[in-house]
Amino acid sequence: MKIKIPLIIFIFFISILFFGLFIETKLIQSPLIGKKLPNYELVELNTGYKSDIRMLPRETFLLNIWASWCLECIREHNTLTIINEDKKLKIVGVNYKDKREDALGWLSIYGNPYIYNIYDYTGELGLDLGVYGVPETFLVDKNRVI
């Protein structure tokens, strides 16, 4: 009996770990769907000028959270570059928890599909957006609703 209880507990935790590996995290929906973008006060990545929600487009746009240290961001960046070619849908970037010089270097290597880039060096805006990890992309309407 003494061996059965620890064995059952062990099997239980291994089962949780095993099933956790197969949960598709890309299918996790944002709790902000249908809600307005949060206000923020940060800086623009390229210029260092103050940035807030008033600087964002008043039309439908993509909001892409990315970082230079994110390998998956390179693959998504290629897709964003293709989307940007016809200029029909504007893309705003949020550089997340990154070093400014690394982010600017990354954009010079891979190209810059963004009309505007918010520098979220502390992750404050990402936290307000409920970011699980980078990259994440939100479709935002003209009323700034996700």
Give the residues covered by each predicted segment.
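N-terminal targeting signals for export/organelle localization
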Residues: 1-43
